[in-house]
Amino acid sequence: MLDKHGRKINYLRVSVTDRCNLRCVYCMPPEGIVKKEHDNIMRYEEIFKVVKSASLLGVNKIRFTGGEPLILKDIDKLIYNTSKINSIKDIAMTTNAILLEDMVEELKKDGLKRVNISLDSLKEDRFKSITRGGDINKVFKSIEKSLSIGMKPIKINTVIMKGINDDEIDDFMNLTKKYPISVRFIELMPIGEGRKLYEDSYISSEEIISKHSDLIPVETDKSSTALLYKFKESKENIGFISPMSCKFCSGCNRVRLTSEGTLKPCLHSEKEVDLKNYVDSSQALLSKINETIYNKPLEHHMIEEKESKSKKMMYQIGG
């Protein structure tokens, strides 16, 4: 469907849980996280009702996120049932891949089309530091398994932070020369824990691109959040997602469902609508989703204000 600004909204990002098995420095605090009661988190059946209703309004792309989505007990069932909705053409997942190796083959059979893997360092000790305890070898094994079963495309999402991992930019880029893997560099955002790092660690996509004159621009879909490039010898693309230096609001085609059941028309807006009160009435749920999508804000003002209006952490909204 179209929002009131004429944008076609066909993409729903679904945070299935706010829980995670890592504690990445820009996403979650190291401690003090209060686990929400199950009654305050959407159940699998409720999530599916929202997905089904959104599909009736023209949503044909679904991405499951977290927290860490593979923690959800019914994630396989959710993917399978979503794949049976005829109008849904693309089912993707963003994961830290710690649990992916043993699950990816069955998830692919269930209907998962592609995965984005959050990976902010290729160095074992640094990865452990950034994630506060993660085992990078589990991620590497998950990538290998995903490649071996033909999961494609596989994209690596890397948040670049000055003085923390920016010395690995070339190493990440070179992955696209060796493997059929895309890499996405994401600008650090002043949201949640990222606010504490932003002033010292933000680095713009433009700064990275300017240092790599051999990058070749690739034609990009209008609704894409990434500007795409590749090297002459690349097997896949290198993307730059630049919410701070080059916002993509004019072509935005997505809304987000949080694990608490609120629908956010914009990641960086305070506005959100609680859908949990409507899931028992299909018509009321459809109407409320329709209304929220139609009233999606024209744009965010994070570039000018240097801060997201969202009061939630990224793990609560969905990465």
From Swiss-Prot:
Top-level taxon: Bacteria
InterPro entries: Aldolase_TIM, Elp3/MiaA/NifB-like_rSAM, MoaA, MoaA_NifB_PqqE_Fe-S-bd_CS, MoaA_twitch, MoCo_biosynth_MoaA/MoaC, rSAM
Gene3D superfamilies per the UniProt record, alphabetical: Aldolase class I
Keywords: 4Fe-4S, GTP-binding, Iron, Iron-sulfur, Lyase, Metal-binding, Molybdenum cofactor biosynthesis, Nucleotide-binding, S-adenosyl-L-methionine
A GO term for molecular function: GTP binding
Binding residues annotated for S-adenosyl-L-methionine, in chain numbering: 26, 67, 118, 189
EC number of the protein: 4.1.99.22
Residues the record lists as binding GTP: 13, 63, 94, 155, 254-256
Annotated binding of [4Fe-4S] cluster 2, by residue: 249, 252, 266
Associated pathway: Cofactor biosynthesis; molybdopterin biosynthesis
Catalytic activity, reaction form: GTP + AH2 + S-adenosyl-L-methionine = (8S)-3',8-cyclo-7,8-dihydroguanosine 5'-triphosphate + 5'-deoxyadenosine + L-methionine + A + H(+)
Record text on cofactor binding: Binds 2 [4Fe-4S] clusters. Binds 1 [4Fe-4S] cluster coordinated with 3 cysteines and an exchangeable S-adenosyl-L-methionine and 1 [4Fe-4S] cluster coordinated with 3 cysteines and the GTP-derived substrate.
CDD domains: Radical_SAM, Twitch_MoaA
GO biological process, one term: Mo-molybdopterin cofactor biosynthetic process
Residue ranges of domain Radical SAM core in the record: 4-219
Cofactors that this protein relies on: [4Fe-4S] cluster
Family: Belongs to the radical SAM superfamily. MoaA family.
HAMAP family: MoaA_B
Subunit structure: Monomer and homodimer.
Function text: Catalyzes the cyclization of GTP to (8S)-3',8-cyclo-7,8-dihydroguanosine 5'-triphosphate.
Stated name of the protein: GTP 3',8-cyclase
Originating species: Clostridium botulinum (strain Okra / Type B1)
Gene: moaA
